[in-house]
């Protein structure tokens, strides 16, 4: 691609008397007797990702250290689609006025540099809010924004050398897409928001400031996308999307408009900040969320949040997700990947006044929904919480924690009916191969029927066993090789106070579909315990529920009462 051919070379910066700023030139070019400045003459922006990322991070850390000598706004703009005028007459302010290409709703500008220091501003004035201005940096100079970038229309900013939105910066547009993946000349001229690796490795995309897309989506595209704790990214009438990948095609609005290819674990998305929108999506090879996500509107995707990784997808620390719909019902949250989980004090909440929403961690019910990829490992920490309650009048929602391999559930799930009416919800915590259950599920309903908890492992033993629970420490997940799932009698007794329980084993994976009751279970809540085994049920201890229902259904091996086993 001719416009990016120069990116295969090294550049240094020299002072340009005509422009009154530092510009990037080929490394063997003469400085022309320009102004001496030790702070800038020796600066080189190689296209190696590590060096470029270090320089970009340094620029962010120093708060744009070149402000004393560089023009305080983007430079060297040339319109390649439509028309653009560049007004530098106001101090520390650039006004760009665009006209769309004939018969289109977009314009495109190639820039030598696109950075805004603190105290400076750039305004891109477009024909209307539905217009789009594509801005590509065609040198090796990274973009660092510490001032204000605003537009009445949608902005696309592309810089393969890296993009940083520093702390204190404000990006205020109708919609905003930033990418460190390349956009080809052909795509720019056609107005296609399609991005891909083009030769050398792209830089990182880092946000520490505020980004708002008032009438559209905010989409951040790079192999590495990082949102700092100080960052706030908002799309009150659209979606906020972090897409860490090698090829990303933005074909339309919302989460359904994103198509990407990722490489795990190299393509990483990290969110420590606050993401707010109709919908929120994080797509990566590896993703970590420990900030705040709020999807509380309903114009595009209706309170929907998707965290999807080809590798690990974890909500950590005090990370939280809240999803509700404008119609008073709970939203929908999916956390999907090869290994998924909530650690520390992480939480997901789809509770709402008219009924709880849906939470899927690692898969959908029974792991059989082809549209929802299944995890191999799911882990819910002891202080982690998932809630899909009806807070006033309505039914509790649906919560699933699933893994084709191992699930360890130590946390808390609530899917309660409303205080003014409604029934409890439906919860499943299952590991197709192995399940460790040591948490608590609440599906009670103050003025309705208690809901249900489904446990769906290959085999399960109820008893005081030395079988160790799975652990997650330092990113290392450890679990025993034994295929049996486990629950203690006290866990079942406690759980039956707040849910009906169904234990349904299968002969999948390494298990044979058996249920072993090795130590007695008693309860007095009146809730139902149902044991359903593909193979056999082995009663080695009594089961007793005062005023309750015990139902058992065995497969080919039948029900075996080994002496002390009774049901009452």
Segment roles from a protein language model:
Residues 8, 19-21, 26, 30-568:
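Extracellular and secretory-pathway beta-repeat/beta-biased strand scaffolds
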């Amino acid at each position: 691609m001719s416009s990016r051919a120069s990116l295969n070379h090294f550049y240094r910066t020299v002072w340009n008397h005509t422009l009154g700023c530092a510009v990037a030139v080929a490394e063997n070019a003469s400085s022309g007797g320009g102004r001496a400045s030790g702070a800038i003459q020796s600066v080189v922006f190689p296209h190696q990702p590590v060096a470029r990322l270090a320089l970009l991070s340094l620029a962010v850390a120093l708060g744009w250290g070149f402000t004393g000598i560089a023009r305080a706004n983007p430079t060297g703009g040339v319109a390649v689609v439509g028309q653009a005028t560049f007004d530098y007459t106001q101090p520390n302010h650039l006004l760009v006025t665009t006209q769309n290409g004939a018969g289109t709703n977009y314009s495109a500008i190639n820039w030598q540099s696109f950075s805004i220091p603190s105290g400076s501003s750039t305004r891109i004035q477009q024909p209307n809010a539905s217009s789009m201005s594509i801005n590509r940096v065609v040198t090796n100079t990274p973009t660092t924004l510490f001032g204000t970038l605003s537009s009445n229309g949608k902005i696309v900013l592309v810089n393969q050398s890296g993009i940083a939105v520093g702390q204190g910066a404000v990006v205020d547009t109708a919609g905003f897409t930033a990418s460190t993946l390349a956009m080809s000349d052909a795509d720019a001229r056609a107005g296609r928001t399609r991005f891909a690796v083009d030769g050398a490795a792209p830089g990182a995309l880092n946000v520490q400031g505020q980004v708002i897309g008032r009438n559209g989506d905010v989409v951040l595209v790079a192999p590495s996308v990082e949102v700092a704790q100080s960052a706030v990214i908002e799309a009150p009438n659209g979606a906020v999307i972090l897409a860490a990948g090698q090829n990303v095609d933005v074909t339309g609005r919302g989460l359904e408009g994103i198509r990407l290819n990722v490489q795990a674990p190299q393509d990483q998305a990290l969110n420590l900040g606050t993401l707010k929108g109709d919908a929120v999506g994080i797509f990566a090879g590896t993703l970590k969320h420990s900030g705040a996500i709020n999807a509380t509107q309903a114009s595009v995707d209706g309170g929907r949040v998707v965290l999807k990784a080809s590798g690990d997808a974890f909500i950590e620390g005090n990370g939280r997700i809240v999803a509700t719909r404008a119609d008073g019902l709970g939203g929908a949250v999916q956390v999907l990947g090869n290994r998924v989980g909530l650690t520390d004090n992480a939480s997901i909440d789809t509770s709402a006044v008219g009924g709880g929403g849906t939470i899927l961690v690692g898969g959908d019910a029974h792991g059989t929904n082809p549209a929802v990829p299944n995890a191999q490992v799911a882990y819910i920490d002891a202080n982690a919480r998932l809630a899909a309650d009806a807070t006033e009048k309505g039914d509790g929602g649906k919560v699933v924690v699933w893994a084709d391999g191992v699930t360890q559930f130590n946390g808390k799930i609530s899917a309660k009916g409303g205080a003014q009416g409604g029934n409890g919800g439906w919860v499943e915590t299952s590991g197709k191969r192995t399940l460790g259950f040591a948490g608590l599920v609440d599906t009670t309903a103050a003025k309705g029927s208690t809901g249900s908890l489904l446990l769906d492992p290959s085999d399960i033993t109820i008893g005081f066993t030395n079988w160790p629970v799975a652990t997650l420490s330092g990113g290392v997940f450890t679990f025993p090789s034994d295929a049996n799932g486990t629950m203690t009698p006290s866990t079942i007794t406690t759980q039956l106070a707040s849910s009906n329980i169904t234990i349904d084993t299968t002969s999948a994976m390494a298990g044979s579909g058996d249920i072993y009751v090795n130590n007695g279970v008693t309860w007095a809540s009146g809730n139902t315990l149902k044991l359903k085994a593909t193979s056999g049920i082995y009663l080695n201890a009594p089961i007793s529920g005062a005023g309750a229902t015990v139902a058992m259904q065995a497969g080919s091996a039948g029900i075996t009462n080994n002496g002390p086993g009774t049901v009452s």
